[in-house]
């Protein structure tokens, strides 16, 4: 986690939101990143997103199920979605984010229950009753 804190300090020095992330595979750090939304003028340039991309390129596969993500703050819904889609094996964060956290702080993307109507039901619900 210390490496993630160091990345957060780098973000702060660069006038970014001070969040850092590290991806570990087989006990080796394979990716480090910090927020770069202002620097890159990119709202998706969060530490977790960048670190996940670097890790996938390093491994040569988008599936990161053998990896661990260490991040200084609970990932937002976008970053939480990326951890789910990349199949990160474990996520460790220093503190919850009750306003924007996607893994329990504000919302729990990893354990949402949902129902989805069949396509026929969706079609029916859009048609007026007189049709």
Predicted regions: what is each one?
Residues 1-13:
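Short, basic/aromatic recognition patches
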Residues 19-24:
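Short beta-strand scaffold segments in enzyme catalytic cores
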Residues 31-37:
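Short beta->alpha transition motifs characteristic of CBS
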Residues 39-49:
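A short, polar/charged loop-to-alpha-helix boundary motif
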Residues 73-86:
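Local cysteine-cluster metal-coordination motifs and their immediate loop/turn environment
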Residues 84-99:
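Iron-sulfur (Fe-S) cluster-binding segments and ferredoxin-like electron-carrier domains
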Residues 114-119, 123:
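Conserved small/polar residues in nucleotide/adenosyl-binding loops
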Residues 126-131:
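Hydrophobic alpha-helical segments, chiefly the membrane-spanning helices
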């Amino acid at each position: 986690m210390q490496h993630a804190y160091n990345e957060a300090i780098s973000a702060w020095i660069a006038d970014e939101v001070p969040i850092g992330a590290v991806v570990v595979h087989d006990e080796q750090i394979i990716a480090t990143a910090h927020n770069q939304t202002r620097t890159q003028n990119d709202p998706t340039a969060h530490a977790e997103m960048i670190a996940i991309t670097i890790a996938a390129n390093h491994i040569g596969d988008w599936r990161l199920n053998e990896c661990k993500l260490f991040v200084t703050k609970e990932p937002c819904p976008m970053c939480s979605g990326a951890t789910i889609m990349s199949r990160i094996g474990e996520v460790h964060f220093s503190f919850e984010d009750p306003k924007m956290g996607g893994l329990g702080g504000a919302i729990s993307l990893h354990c949402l229950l949902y129902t989805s109507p069949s396509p026929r039901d969706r079609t029916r619900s859009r048609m007026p009753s007189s049709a």
